[in-house]
């Protein structure tokens, strides 16, 4: 059997062929549910608003090992820039091309095949295996994993370990696993002024001029030094808008959006307090609202990290590097329940880009890694 026809590749191609742009699922979870049901999983669809979710579980006892992931993908972008149609999975020179190949339908296929192999070899395994799958990870993340977790928490159903299939690898499969993520906090700020004619500035109040010293100081503030697990907290101004577009009108307001990626050395409350103190110090007339996108989390030494390190070394021959860099994932909704969370998936070089692709051999190796992790934890 060639790599192109490995079971993982075949399932990945089937999933990629379904144009499941957020929040659509397009039957991906039904396909996965059929495979899981055949090996003894209880399937529980959870539909919230426009989002399709699935909680699948095999076993009634703890510990509970959970594969977590998403069937939705980001939009394709300019289709004319793709080598092949993004929803017609194609293998070229050992790489599988298609939207979602790396983020994260390749991982989903590897999870399913690894679980099938594990259950066949170990039908009486310890504990339980679960799948938490959503179609709302790439979007507003309102009705996806967070709603499933709320449902599980309400009935006191706990996850012990969660392995998220996000594309964690950097240069080669398994060189990096994510054992934590920074917190994310967004501020939406409006600086108020008085609109007027640029020739009569004494009759107006320019909010851009008023805000400039504040923004300069905000961008230079030192928030913390980070620690051995997290880099220092960073703040980036993401959007600024003011004015009507005309050159002869002083704007009446300036809108600024900024985002913190913060370590465990500070809290969202501390960041908010410092920003609002700075606003008051500059005597600005403002409105501000805050969006909490997720708390920081960290999975330290223990069975999940040990099993993952062992699996990657056994399959690839090299050691992995646990890191907390990068963006957020749905792991941030699982970790607050007390679960230990790691992310392990394909190389992330092409995610969200045109011509997204994954190495075919990597998908088979990823499935082997997942299978060894299951053996280490549930045998």
UniProtKB/Swiss-Prot annotation:
Subunit-level organization: Homodimer.
Gene expressing this chain: dapE
Residues holding Zn(2+) 2: 103, 138, 352
Family of the protein in this entry: Belongs to the peptidase M20A family. DapE subfamily.
GO process annotations (BP): diaminopimelate biosynthetic process; L-arginine biosynthetic process; lysine biosynthetic process via diaminopimelate
Protein name in UniProt: Succinyl-diaminopimelate desuccinylase
NCBIfam families associated with the record: dapE_proteo (TIGR01246), PRK13009.1 (NF009557)
Keyword GTP-binding: no
